């Protein structure tokens, strides 16, 4: 005596053997779709990472330019001080050679 479950399993197995190529193509399509979703997800993550790195690069370039400006500014002050010391024989004021002028 065969049970309905056994009969159903036999029918499914027969159909799978009979339409093996169609089942295989269907499974490949599903796998391809899942891989497509995975690839799209990874691509979006990489694009986000590239944009973040580009922003970091821009921030670092701006900081570099600001540091160069600061370096040139500080260098200009030391250049003026050096010229004042050598060519004009100027020196830093001390308490002895400073004069306090009071306003009345």
From Swiss-Prot:
Q: Give the superkingdom in one word.
A: Bacteria
Q: Which GO terms describe its cellular component?
A: cell division site; plasma membrane
Q: Which cysteines are joined by disulfide bonds?
A: none
Chain ranges on the Periplasmic side, renumbered to this chain: 40-104
The main place the protein resides is: membrane
Which residues are listed as membrane-spanning? 20-39
In Gene Ontology terms, what is a biological process of this protein?
FtsZ-dependent cytokinesis
Keyword Ubl conjugation on entry: no
- Please state where this protein is localized: Cell inner membrane
Which keywords, in A-to-Z order, does the entry hold? Cell cycle, Cell division, Cell inner membrane, Cell membrane, Membrane, Transmembrane, Transmembrane helix
Classify the protein's membrane topology as the record does. Answer: Single-pass type II membrane protein
Membrane-side (Cytoplasmic) residue stretches = 1-19
What family does this chain come from, according to its entry? Belongs to the FtsL family.
Assembly description: Part of a complex composed of FtsB, FtsL and FtsQ.
**What the protein does?**
Essential cell division protein. May link together the upstream cell division proteins, which are predominantly cytoplasmic, with the downstream cell division proteins, which are predominantly periplasmic.
What's the name of the protein? Cell division protein FtsL
Which taxonomic lineage is given here?
A: Bacteria, Pseudomonadati, Pseudomonadota, Gammaproteobacteria, Alteromonadales
